[in-house]
Structure formats: C-alpha cells, structure tokens
Design a protein with these regions (language model features):
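A composition-driven surface/loop motif
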Residues: 3-543
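Long, contiguous ectodomains of secretory-pathway proteins
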Residues: 69, 80-87, 92-94, 99-101, ...
Length: 666
C-alpha cells in the first residue's frame, strides 16, 4: 500500500510540474491564414478565423511574432500599432467595385510589415493596395531578415499603390528594404497620395526610402512618388485660386544600395507633384534614382523630379522649391512641358490669367535646386529646361557644387539650365564641378528659355563648363525665333538672337584647370577664364630664328585668324602674333603672346597650307603648346567646315564643324 501511495504521489508531482512549466512557456510563433477569413491585428491582439471555421477575437499573441500568409480574393488585413510579417501573401480584391468593401490591407498607427517571400496585394475601387488609414504614426515596409522579400502593391481606381485611398493623403511612409513595386490606380500616386476630391486629399508627404529596390508607377495623373491627381479638385482656377491637392513634399531617398525607379502618370511628375500639384523638399542622397514625368500627348507633362503638369480642370502646373541631390546617381527626364528637374507645365496660367506673370509670379517656378557631388543627367521635354522651369516656368537659385558631374539638356524652346519656354533663368551658381548644358531651339545654354531672360550666372573654382546655345527655329506659322545665347537670354520673335551676358568668372581657378567654353548665338566658340599673369619678356630670339614666310605662304596663312579673349582678330598684329615655318619638318608655328587664344579658319584654308607643303600646324601661347596633323584635320569635313583650336590658360580644346575633337590635339 505504501508503495502504491508513493507512486501516486510521484505521478501527481510530475503532472503538476509539467502543468507549471507549460503555463510559463510562451506560445509558439503562429501563422495566420488569410484564406480562412479577415485578419485584424491591434497591437498584440489578433482576430482571425482558423481552418475549422472557428473565429477568435482579440486573441493575445504572446511572443509578438505575427506572420500572415495564404491567398484570398475576398478577405482583408488590418494592422494597428503592430509589427507583422507578410509571407507569400496574396490578396486580390481588384474586382471590388465599391469603396465600402475596404482596402485589401489597411495600416494605421506605428506599424511595420516585414517581407518574406513573394507578396502581392491588390485593392479595388477607391482604395490603396496597402492603405495608410490615418495620419497617426509611421508605416514601415522592410526586409530586415534579408531573405529577398518582395511586395507588389496595386491600388484600385483612386487609390495609391502604397499610401492614400480616394480623397485621402498618403503620409508618413517608410521603405527600408525589400524589392517593392507600387502601382497607383487611376488618378493616384504609386507611393503617396490617392486622388484628391472637392473635400481635399491627394497629397503625398513624409515619404522615406532608405533601402531596397523600389519601383513606383503613378496611375493617370498621379506621381510615381508623391501627390495624386490635384486636378480632380479643379486645381487652380479663377474662383478658388487653390491647387486642391496633388502636392508631393518631404520626400527623402538615401542609401548607397538604394535603387529607385519612378514613373509619373500622364501629366504628373516621376517624383513630386501629381497633376496640378506642386512639390516641396525632395532630398536624394547616396542612392541611384531614375525618374520620369509624363504627359498625355498634349504637352502637359510633369517634371522628372519636381512639380506636376497642368490638367483639364485649370491647374497651373506644379512649381517646386528645395530639391537637394547629394552624392547620388540621378537620371531625370520628362515629356513635353516638364523639366527634367524642376517644374511642370504651367500653361493653365495662360488660359485663366491673361496677366499671369503679374498675378501669379511664383506659379510654375523652380527654385532652390542644389546638386552637390555625384552624377546627374537631366533632360527636359519640349518647352522645358533640363534643370529649371517647365513650360512658362522660370528657374532660379540653382546651385551646382562639390565636384558634381552634371549634364542638362533643354527640350525645344527650353534652356539647358534656367527657364522653360517664356521663363527666365537667374541666380545660377557653378563651383568646382563639371557641367555640360545645352539649350533647345531658341533656348540659352544657361539662362532664359525662348523669350526669357538670363541673369546672375556665377562660375568659380576648378569648374569645367561646356555650354551650347539652342539654334534658331521657325514655327509652322512662319514665325522665326532667333538662336538662344550661350549664357544669357533666349531667342525672340523675328529672328532676334538671345543677348549674351557676361558670367561672373572672377572666382575661376585657372591654375586648377577651371574654364568655360560656350557657343554664342552667332555660333562662335567662346572661352572665358580670368586673365593669367604674363610671363617675363625675353626679347632675345637667338641665332636660330626661322626665316620669314614666303609670299605664297603668307597668302595661305592670311586665311586663318588668331582671336584674343575679346574675339578680335590679332593675326596681323606682329607685336602679339608671329608665324614661322620649318621647311625641313614641314611645320608652321604660330606664336601668340596671349593666355587665351583661338586659332580658327576653314578646312579649305588648311588645304591651302597643305598645298604649300605644310603637314603640321602648331599654336604656342603663354601657357600651352599644341600641334595638329593637317591630314587628320582636313579629313573631317568640306572646304567650308570651320575649325577652332582654343587655348584657355594651359588647356587646349579643338572643335571641327561644331563637334569636339580633342583626340586630334598632339
């Protein structure tokens, strides 16, 4: 008996111990399956349905590891102030035709979504694919587990891919990792605002991308990243004088491994404003970004990065202030009406405001654009600058510095850097950077677009700047517009050429190889650097001076010109320019006591020298000596093709027929 009691007591003790141990252990991680029903997560409580159809309300998840998986075309997920994992989750509610059906995924408060596997979320009418349901807290999408998690989020009509639903803003959104694709529904952003309505909405703000590979495509009139369709609220009009939504602001992209591709919908920016929406404070650092604005075949494009375009409701088109690009690799482009980086089409101003420049001087303006280091290529659509204003937009307070490498190409009627068609370009500063700027037809290389003014251009430090003016052009109506200036004004009606302005070059460091080369509206290649000190004079020519040129050689040489910094021909001024010919070496040497000099003529004049036996021509200036092989040079064009060999302090440059051929300098 005592033995049996002892055994019973032992069994009881073991049982009690097991129960105590079991109650102290946390619940194991649990997967919640969307195919069984809706899933609602509120902090650490989960409401769900299991595979047997049993419903659980506010069941506490002890370990906080909440994984949602499975496939459904009718059930939804809502997350509030919680951290969840999407694992191979597929929800397709795209067939939903009423907004009352709700978003496929709704997120509120401070919440995060970890991406594992392949996840695809699609909402129906009026909702974002992943909808930021309130303005409280930040929604974060991440791949902290580094398992190459992916997400494709598709908005329904009026809903962003990730962000706001119809009539709602999309704000406080962070993406820190994963392969993320966000496709906006009609009139909504890829990431950001939904479509605006008469009661507001449509703005996209406080959007941060700090990691991952992100692709964002706006729906019609929605930005890739930023604002939805502001024109849905009638945009800027005479009655309301209000943009009504579509703004993209406080957008930050950073991280060396971050890659972002953004495509705006019709009349919207790639990154920035939706249709009729402006943009404010866009920062891109250390990352790779490709961003394009688009039109709807009517020339109303938004910018690649910046403001949206003008829409049918009378929107003015988006201006932009405060774009900062630092140590990033950025390619930005736009269709007709939008700048590569800057503002979108502002032509709504013409329709609604005959005196728009006086009544709305800041609409469509691109200002406070700073590029510091990195590589940037910006191409404007027709009527727009590469960097600066879109159609009717001005570009001002543009700064390029800190060894930036920038290429800016204006579309037809736009400046390379400065104003779009009808827009001015002012307060443009370039320091210690490599810049190439080309204007479109009638646009300045740097300055005003067609009919616009250019002023206050400063170039300093060890900058190397190459500028090409836009040529003159004729409209189908027969109206002729003159060529734009290299640096200065755009061309005007009646073939009036853009007036050149003198840039402030007092701060250029010529000893550090700084210079500026540009073509003026007469297609003359100009080179400007500060004057360098002349070398000490040496009147002794020695006993080995070359003999004087023969009469026939002088005749051939007279077809060439040597121009100084003021473009005057100094070839016949023997106190400055001398020529000698070494018949044994067949070398014609032209010496000019100048720091800046241009040897120019036609290839026909060089062929005349070849007929005299010359095979090589040398230009010797105060700080530089360069030689050209005439056979190589004359093979590049016909008799009337113009060549120019430019010496800027110690730097030579050769152009033939308007194209650079520095490879032929010896």
């Amino acid at each position: 008996m005592r033995l049996k009691k002892s055994i019973k007591r032992g069994i009881a003790a073991v049982t009690i111990t097991g129960i105590m141990a079991s109650s102290a252990m946390p619940a194991f991680a649990k997967d919640y399956h969307i195919e069984y029903g809706d899933i609602k997560v509120d902090q650490d409580k989960v409401s769900y349905t299991d595979k047997d159809g049993t419903k659980y309300d506010n069941e506490k998840n002890e370990d906080g590891d909440i994984t949602i998986t499975g496939k459904s075309d009718e059930n939804t997920v809502s997350v509030k102030d919680a951290d969840v994992t999407f694992k191979d989750l597929e929800i397709d509610r795209s067939a939903s035709s009423t907004a009352a059906d709700g978003a496929a995924v709704s997120v509120s408060g401070n919440s995060s979504i970890e991406l594992d596997g392949k996840n695809t979320i699609s909402s129906g009418m009026g909702h974002a694919g992943i909808e930021k349901a309130d303005d409280n807290g930040t929604m974060t999408i991440k791949d902290d587990n580094n398992v190459s998690g992916s997400l494709t989020a598709n908005g329904g009509f009026g809903g962003a891919g990730i962000g706001g639903g119809n009539g709602a803003d999309g704000s406080d959104i962070t993406i820190s990792g994963g392969n993320v694709t966000a496709n906006g529904g009609g009139h909504a952003a890829g990431i950001g605002g939904g479509s605006s309505s008469s009661s507001g909405g449509g703005n996209g703000s406080d959007i941060t991308i700090s990691g991952g590979n992100v692709t964002a495509n706006g729906g019609t009139a929605g930005a890739g990243i930023g604002g939805g369709d502001g024109d849905a609220a009638n945009g800027l009009n005479k009655e309301s004088d209000s943009t009504g939504g579509g703004r993209g602001s406080n957008i930050t992209i950073s991280g060396k491994n971050t890659i972002v591709k953004a495509e705006g919908g019709a009349e919207a920016a790639g990154i920035g404003g939706g249709r009729s929406g402006d943009a404010d404070t866009i920062e891109i650092t250390d990352s790779t970004v490709i961003s394009n604005g688009h039109d709807s075949d009517n020339g109303n494009s938004g910018a690649g990065i910046g403001g949206g375009g003008f829409g049918a409701g009378g929107g003015a088109g988006g201006g932009i202030s405060n774009i900062t690009i630092k140590d990033a690799d950025v390619t930005a482009g736009a269709d007709a009406g939008g700048a590569g980086i800057g503002s979108g089409n502002a032509s709504g101003l013409i329709i609604y405001y005959p005196n728009w420049k006086d009544e709305h001087p800041n609409e469509g303006v691109a200002s406070d654009i700073t590029i510091s280091g990195g590589r940037v290529k910006a191409s404007g659509g027709d009527d727009s600058a590469g960097i600066g204003g879109g159609y009717l937009g001005s570009g001002s307070d543009i700064t390029i510095k800190d060894n930036a490498d920038v290429t800016a190409n204006g579309g037809k009627w736009g400046a390379g850097i400065g104003g779009g068609r009808g827009g001015d370009g002012s307060d443009i500063s370039i320091s210690d950077s490599n810049v190439s700027a080309s204007g479109g037809a009638a646009g300045a290389g740097i300055g005003g677009g067609r009919g616009g003014k250019g002023e206050n251009v400063t170039i300093s430090g060890s900058s190397t700047v190459s500028v090409k003016h836009g040529p003159g052009a004729t409209l189908t109506s027969g109206t002729c517009y003159g060529a734009g200036a290299g640096i200065g004004n755009g061309g005007g009606k009646d073939d009036v050429r853009g007036e050149e302005i003198a840039p402030d070059i007092s701060g250029i460091d010529s000893t550090g190889q700084g210079y500026i080369n540009y073509y003026d509206s007469d297609n003359n290649l100009l080179t400007r650097v500060p004057s360098a000190p002349a070398p000490e004079e040496n009147d002794s020519k020695g006993d080995d001076a070359e003999p004087a040129l023969s009469a026939s050689m002088k005749q051939a040489v007279s077809q060439l010109e040597v121009r100084g910094a003021l473009r005057q021909n100094l070839m016949q001024d023997t106190s400055i320019v001398q020529q000698d010919y070494d018949a044994d070496a067949h070398v014609l040497t032209i010496r000019a006591e100048l720091s800046i000099a241009t040897l120019t003529g036609t290839l026909g004049s060089l062929k005349a020298l070849q007929a005299q036996g010359v095979t090589t021509i040398a230009l010797v200036t105060q700080h530089c000596t360069s030689t050209l092989d005439l056979a190589e040079l004359t093979a590049l064009g016909g008799e009337d093709t113009v060549f120019s060999l430019v010496h800027t302090a110690g730097i030579p440059a050769l152009s033939v027929g308007g194209a650079l051929h520095n490879e032929l300098i010896h």
